[in-house]
Design a protein with these regions (language model features):
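Residues forming the flavin
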Residues: 1-326
Length: 326
């Protein structure tokens, strides 16, 4: 069994399969295991690696799966010495790996989407999840006066952690109502959009407007703008097999279509956002693999796509008079 991705779903799938005595390889393109768990301040990737290896799982970090071919063959690139300042000359810089698996579990995750609005590409603009990784993985607070603009629930934990780290945080949410508890120090503006960033080499302020009134603007002084326009499952590896992604209207993203080969997609790559549901999907995915291989026969049922408390709102761009959308 080959597992691609070491986030919550991939790890759960690998452990479940290893517990059933399957020969498991887990590959991860990052130098550390954990996927989006690396953005959790209490997470220990070295402990996770020890747990996986103690279960007999072969772990290959710094290894990117770049293609899925006929008969569940996967092409992967392992970066052997790129990260070493003075590498052993007997070692290659990189290795090309051909992995022939009987079943593939894709736990490749999802990418946070940006939102198009005026002057949104100057230094100081990044996705909300990137700022959370900087804070908890690298110990870097990316701004002192931060505005987060969103249409979904995923930014709220980030906002709380940035506030606890000492930043002043303001949230602009395009939705009308949400049911999330926030510290009173965090300002929340509902039905509010980012209109234009002011500044050239750095952010000086952000002009904002209401969803139903873009002619009247307010200005918020800030030094950083974080953006989350939703999440897109990473489905390109199943697309290599000619499997067309399917639009999911409730979650505003493409999810993998029906797969008839020995490939199972789990976690946020399947459009599942809640961490506990991702773990469950990994366990279910491993059981599906064992069913397919004739090792075991269990009733399986994947968690539903989605998982946020409040529905996402469609927001891809904010039109302005300066740059009207065609």
């Amino acid at each position: 069994l080959l597992v691609v991705g070491s986030g919550p779903a991939g790890v759960a799938a690998a452990k479940e399969a290893a517990n059933q005595n399957l020969n498991v390889i887990l590959i991860e393109q990052d130098s550390l295991l954990g996927g989006n768990n690396l953005a959790d301040k209490e997470f220990d990737p070295s402990l996770l690696q020890k747990q996986l290896e103690s279960n007999g799982i072969r772990v290959m970090s710094r290894t990117t799966a770049f293609g899925v071919y006929d008969n569940t063959v996967v092409g992967a690139l392992e970066r052997v010495t790129d990260h070493i300042s003075n590498p052993n000359t007997s070692l290659p810089r990189q290795r090309f790996r051909t992995i022939r698996a009987k079943h593939i579990i894709l736990a490749s995750g999802a990418l946070e989407r940006h939102i198009a609005f005026n002057n949104n590409d100057i230094p100081g603009v990044m996705t909300a999840n990137a700022a959370r990784h900087y804070l908890n993985r690298y110990g870097v607070l990316t701004g002192k006066n931060i505005v987060i603009t969103t249409n979904n629930d995923s930014v709220y934990q980030t906002a709380i952690e940035l506030h606890e780290a000492g930043s002043k945080v303001t949230i602009l949410d395009s939705r009308k109502d949400i049911n999330i508890n926030l510290p009173k120090e965090i300002e929340l503006h509902l039905e509010t959009l980012p209109l234009s960033i002011n500044g050239s080499k750095k952010i000086e302020s952000l002009d904002v407007c209401k969803v139903n009134d873009k002619t009247h603007k307010n200005t918020i002084i800030c030094d950083q703008v974080l953006v989350s326009g939703g999440w897109s499952p990473i489905v390109h590896l199943v697309s290599h097999r000619g499997i067309k992604p399917v639009w999911n209207e409730d979650n505003l993203c493409f999810v993998p279509g029906d797969i008839k080969e020995n490939i199972t997609v789990v976690g946020s790559a399947r459009g599942i956002w809640n961490t506990d549901d991702c773990v469950e999907s990994g366990i279910v995915g491993a059981n599906e693999a064992m069913n397919t291989l004739g090792i075991d026969k269990k009733e399986i049922s994947f968690p539903s796509v989605g998982g946020w408390s409040n529905p996402i709102n469609a927001l891809y761009e904010v039109k302005s008079n300066k740059f009207p959308s065609k």
